[in-house]
């Protein structure tokens, strides 16, 4: 567990069903909100995002009364909200981006939320590298569709517009390298796609870039392609900055797998036929 993520682990609770959950009051303090009332608007925006994504708010935000000590023997009932992992993911997306701990929270809950789509975290750890690549590439494929929709709503209208929009995201994440430069750096042939020649770590960084850009385009009500391009670049740069702060390898420095995603998919199909 990364040291920047450890505080989120330390306040994690496990309910009777074995599900992970967090106290809104504890999370608010960890995220740098000195008073709970300042954190409430963030929770409200997260609830709205939950509802807009088609989820039931009560499934992820459970309001409770928690008895806390206020003296030697006295206790007082305080309102709190029990947050699911997905709720925490939405909360950190709607928090104050100026707070350094928010960046750590965004990476922590984004990674944890993606892993939850598998049976459990242990299953993800036990996957081989090629299985992780297939899983993350499929995730990225689906989220890129949602990113296209969000970009279109923001004013990115044509195929050329979208290519420029995508390049801004890559340039932010890859320290100025656009799609063509990344393609050349990987030594790929003209018909080979860069996303099909990324390892799991690089795919995870790009998945994070895509999901965060989609969220920010919607949250900020972006309504011009110039603004959308800037947003994509800024998110990519922020992901790069977070990788750097956590001591990770820059995306352009990661090794390029010799076996492509297409080859892995074909191997799976052959195995399934046997």
UniProtKB/Swiss-Prot annotation:
Where do the TM regions start and end? none
GO BP annotations of the record are: DNA damage response; SOS response
Q: What is this protein called?
A: DNA damage-inducible protein D
Q: Which InterPro entries match?
A: BRO_N_domain (IPR003497)
Q: When this gene is knocked out, what is seen?
A: A double yicC-dniD deletion in rich medium makes filamentous cells with little DNA in stationary phase, has no growth defect in minimal medium, does not grow at 45 degrees Celsius. A single dinD deletion has a similar but less extreme phenotype.
NCBIfam families, per database record: PRK11525.1
């Amino acid at each position: 567990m990364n040291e920047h993520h450890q505080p989120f682990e330390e306040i994690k609770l496990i309910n009777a069903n074995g599900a992970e959950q967090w106290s809104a009051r504890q999370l608010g303090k960890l995220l740098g909100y000195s008073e709970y009332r300042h954190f409430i608007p963030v929770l409200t925006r997260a609830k709205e995002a939950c509802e807009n994504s088609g989820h039931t708010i009560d499934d992820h935000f459970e309001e409770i009364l928690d008895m806390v000590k206020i003296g030697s023997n006295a206790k007082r009932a305080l309102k709190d909200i029990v947050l699911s992992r997905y709720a925490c993911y939405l909360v950190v997306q709607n928090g104050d981006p100026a707070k350094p701990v928010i960046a750590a929270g965004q990476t922590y809950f984004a990674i944890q939320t993606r892993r939850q789509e598998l049976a459990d975290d242990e299953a993800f750890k036990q996957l081989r590298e090629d299985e992780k690549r297939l899983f993350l590439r499929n995730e990225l494929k689906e989220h890129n569709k949602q990113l296209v929709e969000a970009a279109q709503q923001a004013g990115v209208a044509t195929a050329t517009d979208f290519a420029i929009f995508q390049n801004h995201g890559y340039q932010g994440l890859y320290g100025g390298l656009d799609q063509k430069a990344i393609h050349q750096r990987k030594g790929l042939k003209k018909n080979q796609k860069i996303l099909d020649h990324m390892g799991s770590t690089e795919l995870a960084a790009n998945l994070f870039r895509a999901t965060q850009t989609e969220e920010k385009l919607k949250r900020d009500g972006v309504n011009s392609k110039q603004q959308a391009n800037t947003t994509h670049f800024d998110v990519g740069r922020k992901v790069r900055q977070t990788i750097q702060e956590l001591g990770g390898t820059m995306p352009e420095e990661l090794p390029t797998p010799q076996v492509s995603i297409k080859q892995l998919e074909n191997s799976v199909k052959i195995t399934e036929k046997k």
